[in-house]
Design a protein with these regions (language model features):
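Conserved mixed alpha/beta core segments that line enzyme active sites in large multi-domain catalysts
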Residues: 1-170
Length: 170
């Protein structure tokens, strides 16, 4: 198990609009359960997949984190101190490295991915970043792609052109 200082989800496609040139990263302090379950509003980063530029960052007020309690040997939510609630859970270099991993996992599987990641407290950067789950993105990946020809087939367009009268100047 990763001793997570931060964790969350990452999409190799913008899940809001299907933009394949963007990576969306959401995260919070502690283990990813807080993000996946919706118990916290995560920080959100929109990154250009080609330039690795962070185009948008929304730092949320995170009230708690999901952590391992070594005394009880159980996972639990603990309240964050007020001065830490609006602190960014990721450094910019971590956002960029997660984006690099996003590109690799998408290239490996050949389609946009919905992944979960975790950053270890005890390992140095970038060895501290782990992808703990990857699966095909399920919303935009299932949508039927609109043909560049519209609803007509290539044959329909060719046949239409062949039957269209043309004027020939003599």
């Amino acid at each position: 198990m990763v001793d997570a200082k931060a964790a969350g989800v990452m999409f190799t496609i913008n899940p809001v609009n299907g933009d394949v040139s963007k990576v969306v990263i959401e995260g919070s302090f502690g283990f990813g359960e807080a993000v996946v379950s919706g118990n916290v509003t995560p920080d959100r980063y929109l990154v250009d997949k080609v330039t690795l530029v962070i185009e948008e960052r929304v730092i949320s007020d995170k009230g708690s984190e999901f952590v391992y309690n070594p005394k009880t040997k159980e996972m639990e939510y603990i309240e964050l101190p007020p001065d830490q609630r609006k602190v960014q859970c990721l450094e910019d270099r971590e956002v960029i490295e997660i984006t690099r991993l996003a590109k690799k996992v998408e290239a490996h599987f050949g389609c946009p991915q919905d992944t979960e990641w975790s950053i270890s407290r005890s390992l140095p950067f970038p060895e501290s970043i782990f992808l703990v789950q990857a699966r095909p993105e399920s919303v935009w990946g299932k949508k039927k792609k609109e043909s560049v020809l519209g609803k007509k087939t290539g044959f329909d367009l060719l046949f239409e052109k062949a039957l269209t009268p043309t004027k020939i100047k003599v």
